[in-house]
Amino acid sequence: VVPFEQNREIRFSEETREDIIRACFAMGKVKTGALIVVEQAIRLTEYESTGIQMDCLVSSQVLINIFEHNTPLHDGAIIVRGDRIVSATCYLPLSDNMGISKDLGTRHRAAVGMSEVSDALVITVSEETGAVSVAQGGELTRSINEAELRVKLEEVQHKSSETNRIKAMWKGWRKHAKKNN
């Protein structure tokens, strides 16, 4: 990474957005589980380092290939930064939120957990049902359709990084304040 690019606002292209959508719903049709973390303002370096480092343009074919059963990279999450997949097989923090439905597994708990500690948008594809869900800000929106996923990704795509940083700091402060009360 070039030092002067560190603070550059990184957003993904429409092509990346559409490839993510296409891959998620293709995997859903054949019930291939997936966990895709779309990084925003907060760098996910700590979680990125738990996986296998990659530097690959996002494409629906690559995403589908990564999560294919019995392949070396299918377990864990991938992290997307801008238009690139930067890491695969990443471990994410699990949510300890007791309000999460008991019928949801580790993948969904990890999605919510990651969204509790960062400003990332986390997309899951259920291996059991094929349903696509999104976690953001500690909330899980289950069984969304292609249009709804497109709206969520467009919101992320067009947010300013300064707004994201302020919201993340506020959320972190609130969570810390709740634990100390």
Predicted regions and their residues:
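Divalent-cation
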Residues: 1-181
